[in-house]
């Protein structure tokens, strides 16, 4: 049903349009509100026809009222409109919406039925706060009966998903539509969502997680249930998969009830929240009002994002009270703060209506200018006091006559009042003869700039400034072309005598419209020409136009002649209440007016493709009409500016383009997919290897920070390479050939643009640096830091020279990002005249921390550690060790909470760094903080740090302070060389004797800097020293340990040269732990001096590195014992070589331990399982192990006992059937394909769940294996046209499963779980997920045996395909044989019989079937011929001449 506009007629419509939307407001109801209401009713599955009568409106109000509490703002607006409409139909006199709502409330209270008894009244009062939208209703007999959801409710839910697509409004809409529903109803709602399979998969995973959590917290009661008692629901019962509708109703209506429907709704809402966060990733903190954005639009964005935030209502209320005002633009914020803290949203909207942006400023300017233009009486009107006639005074600020600049009411203009340029005042202006407001700038007698000399013809456009040209082919004529005396009017090329308007001021000129003269602004951003109240002849028609300040009503006059600077244009003029007269593009294009951007005349950098490669030839994909129109408009402007050029069909290259809408804007942005060109383009060397650091800056008296605008588009591209950047704008339905362009400048997104721009900028700045050696310029991409020791005026003059120098080469430096006064914001730092710091850092306060929150927190702390000494993050980093999802909640340990609290205290006091003085020495001081964490300061004067930092890496499990100190020194030295070009003098907390004792043995490890000792506790020392020679007279201990890898039982012991021996049994150990345990026993049983001999290289390596800390408890105990000894000698001998004491102790500890280790293959099987986690069948088969041994290896692996051994066995399906599905892991998408008959697996991580990626995967699969049928779910990627086209081309039949029916995708669903399980077992062996996926696929296909035939999946698929080929060939042979007939003679009967059917042909006989009898006939008595139809057997029979071997073999 369409939108209804005829609900009211006659007097009712007049009454409707006299009612105000708000009390005290200005806006009234209009016809459009009725149309909107009817459309909204269709969305909510209500009949718009009910709006025609009062009774119908009452029914609609009763239907919508229960959902008001949880509904959106749109629902409330609809309810309000219907309430007003009801009053109009009922002839109830009201003046605004609030009065209508009051009347409705009165009516409802009057018609409210009186309760018969107090209990009924109490029940009614209780029910009044509860929605009556319950599918469970009570019958007359008192039984609770379930009413299924109506098709109208389901239709409303589907429309919500289609229109909103998981925006934040979906959650309250779902809550409203599903109130009181059973799990079966909720599953019905979910099943109606056909597309969005990725979102549904996420929802399914959340429901599974919540169901598992429910089962953990609600264990099954022990023992049988009493008769008649309901069982407790499990998680799967609540989700509606293992419970019936009757059970759900029984739980919900029991006493006490179990609200399974509400619990399931809560789970679904949790999943929807996660989906909404993915579809709406913008945080509420990022919602800020733009300088030109209306307050109303900002509030809409704010509340839309607020609904998506996962926070409590109290937190959301706080966000509304603080962030809404805090993030408004300055114009609105000033008004909002004036309203006070208790202001309502309505008051805010009213106060900020029309505030901010160009429209607001234009109105202020227009008011000021109108006051200025009023005739005023000035003291200078009495001119009789002066000799001669003087010219009237003129304002330098606004250019009007009659007042001085100090009395001007117009907004103050920045820059010089004489020439209009920034950077100096009028009294310091050196631009003689140039007047900012002189008439020549807006008339034909204007200066014409000098064109470049003829030897620079290569440049396309090279104006000295960005200017607005009124260009054309004709020459201008008029008086005053010769110019005034003293003015330079030299023209290098007469044919280019174009009028030129600089943009140092607003381009306002005088134009003649019809017969009237007006001042108007030339606006290249406006589509239409709009003039304030003007009397024009001819017919007009009303029109509504939208601008920055809102909609205004105008009169449209067509075919109006407009004279602009002597050029005439005929077009449409709109007349209405505009704050500024505007000449738009509809007239500017007729007179040839262009906005010219300079392209630099610099030498281009030659670029080539990689050897052997050609340019990209990627077809342009289809685009929508609005995108094509947007791209045409953008490219037309770029072509006028010389950035791109049109090309013909001779260029064979193409790169696809597309368009996206800019953030929070209706404008489009052009994007070019240069991925293919980037692959083929030569590699570039980044000329800048890092970003500059403020600690390396020398202190300067004057500083300025600049930003280069339109950087890439001001830099030319190599002419020979331009052809490879070609792209095409297509047309709808191939109406016309596509428009072809190529780039003339560096394109955005191309790999060479950054390096070429940096190199070009360096060449451009080189002559300026030579000319001004006193100026220091730090350049990083388009950010420029300019420092000098000149006086401020001289410095700013030099900066203007730099800006002019860049401008000559085509690089502009916008005033908006020109920082003249400190503090300067540069590269994330805040620079002051004598100090620097990082930009303000505020650590978030959170009750719940996720992995992503911790990562951001650690990043902030690392950034702050540049200047804040003492910051530590080791305990915080421990919280997020391992592979975790970004949204996983993290529980703080006590150590991490303490560390964060200490960091907060450190950041409370702002700290600053100083600048570098080349005349002073660099000093680096290092302190030990404990727990493997170090901090350092680099300074030139004590307590004035240039830079600070921290170090907390532990490169091995067993280390000591000396090792870590060496690593800190190496880091600080490298950092100093990068920033200052030299190494500092180190002050280390270690005594010289300890340091030199270490370096005596480890001098070859690294380089030693210059250093001195500083007594800063805690000091670094070596806690024990190992002897280099055996200790004479000390007892010698031969130590050894052994462990059984299967039982984890072991022994450790020692034998001494004095006859002592000891052996202990150890549980749950390994060979390496047993060896260390033996050394610990020797140290505990020995005296102050001891010699120890071991055959373990592992133990020898740990102890010889002299660690003083370790993550191993056993090694820590050994360290404690070593510190107690006076002298220790440790030696190693090879095992099992007949060495006396070693052999004795080896026999001692091996007794009862190493028996099973003599089985061949166990070591190899263990290594194979550690790497691939093979199942026991594969190991038993590959390494000839008994099944019990192989099973024990699997049982001893902690990673293989998560869910037990996988179940195997597949349905014997057709060999060509594959099942495909997408699963999600670590936030990435894995596309899985399973060969149903064999269980063989193909999987791949794909960048996006799109049809294109899926089709590419299917084609790769079809290229490797015979694929006849693919079975998928109904996901949008599988149902896409791209996949259908790929299946058609590869002759693959596509079948679809049933949504939410796991049996339809059983093979691939179970394989998804198996794949994730294998990935979990080997994830720590791979850095990237895509590597882990391929490793898991290899393990599944070739390292797991079982199922049909006891094969691996790889062997099984090969066997199935080979068998299928053989049976197909055999069937072909059988069919061939059956095409022949046999004539035969039986016994001695000379008459040929037949024809009989040939069943099989052997070497000596054939098997035939004749009249149902199967006979074996010798070959010599049979004649085989092809069946040519009916033949007569006899003497002249064709059988006698037929060769039986003809066409038979």
From Swiss-Prot:
- SMART domains the record matches: ZnF_C2HC (SM00343)
Residue span of region Disordered:
447-489
GO cellular component terms attached to this protein's record: host cell; host cell nucleus; host cell plasma membrane; host multivesicular body; membrane; viral nucleocapsid; virion membrane
Q: How is the cofactor bound?
A: Binds 2 magnesium ions for reverse transcriptase polymerase activity. Binds 2 magnesium ions for ribonuclease H (RNase H) activity. Substrate-binding is a precondition for magnesium binding.
Q: Where is this region: Dimerization/Multimerization of capsid protein p24?
A: 279-365
Question: What is an example of a GO molecular function annotated in this UniProt entry?
Answer: aspartic-type endopeptidase activity
- Region annotated Interaction with host AP3D1 sits at 12-19
Where are the annotated coiled coils located? none
Tryptophan repeat motif: where is this motif?
A: 995-1011
Q: Where is this region: Interaction with membrane phosphatidylinositol 4,5-bisphosphate and RNA?
A: 14-33
Annotated stretches, region: Interaction with host CALM1: 8-43
Kindly list the ranges of residues that form Integrase-type zinc fingers according to the record: 1160-1201
Indicate the transmembrane segments per the record: none
- The residues that make up the annotated DNA-binding region are 1380-1427
Keywords from UniProt, A to Z, are:
Activation of host caspases by virus, AIDS, Aspartyl protease, Capsid protein, DNA integration, DNA recombination, DNA-binding, DNA-directed DNA polymerase, Endonuclease, Eukaryotic host gene expression shutoff by virus, Eukaryotic host translation shutoff by virus, Host cell membrane, Host cytoplasm, Host endosome, Host gene expression shutoff by virus, Host membrane, Host nucleus, Host-virus interaction, Hydrolase, Lipid-binding, Lipoprotein, Magnesium, Membrane, Metal-binding, Modulation of host cell apoptosis by virus, Multifunctional enzyme, Myristate, Nuclease, Nucleotidyltransferase, Phosphoprotein, Protease, Repeat, RNA-binding, RNA-directed DNA polymerase, Transferase, Viral genome integration, Viral nucleoprotein, Viral penetration into host nucleus, Viral release from host cell, Virion, Virion maturation, Virus entry into host cell, Zinc, Zinc-finger
**Segments of this protein annotated with the region Interaction with membrane phosphatidylinositol 4,5-bisphosphate:** 73-77
Positions that bind Zn(2+): 1169, 1173, 1197, 1200
- Write down which residues bear the modification named Phosphotyrosine: 134
Q: Ranges of Basic and acidic residues compositional bias? A: 447-461
Q: Where is this motif: Nuclear export signal?
A: 16-22
State the protein's name. Gag-Pol polyprotein
Protein's gene: gag-pol
